[in-house]
Amino acid sequence: MAKPLKIMVFGDSLVAGFGLPPGEAFPDILAQKLSQYGYQNEMINAGVSGDTTAGGVTRIDWALADKPDVVVLVLGGNDMLRGLRPAASEQNLRIILTRLADEGVPVLFCGMLAPENLGADYAAEFNPLYPRLADEFNTSFIPFFLQDVALVPALNQPDGLHPNRAGIDVIVQNLMPELLVLLASRGEQKG
């Protein structure tokens, strides 16, 4: 029997499971879905509520001590909500992606999109940084982590920012095709 696939989801409150009951955070549901597809897995929830890309830089080496086989990277939403300079966010994400590449860890990189209320200029600077980095590092890529969930009240908690369980299900469903391709391309074994 193949050893379980060690998958780390590295990110912020969208990963940590802010406002969700235990066992219903994104990594938990992702682990269940992977098991349904035949991938035995050990899921590591490396989500920290409120984390920024700068925070991610400070803890990536610590996180890599767990020796993940694959990393799902979901960071930058808090940078955006705080109006931090997109160039700084991009540089921080580049540092994290470089560390993952140095360790030979394949990445499913999940992008964020700035909402219109932050202004067209900010969005024009922030939104392209994710596809640019995905190209630079040749990672598997999800252009918008909250695709089909953002701004849909029925799929979010009352704060309008964090997905509820139904929203998590949509996110996992959207991510699975890209993650399955990544795992297959790495020759990861089911079982």
Predicted ranges, named:
Residues 1-49, 59-67:
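Serine-esterase "nucleophile elbow" of acetyl-processing enzymes
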Residues 50-54:
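Acidic-and-aromatic substrate-binding clefts and catalytic sites of carbohydrate-active enzymes
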Residues 29-39, 55-191:
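Alpha-helical cap/lid subdomain in secreted, periplasmic
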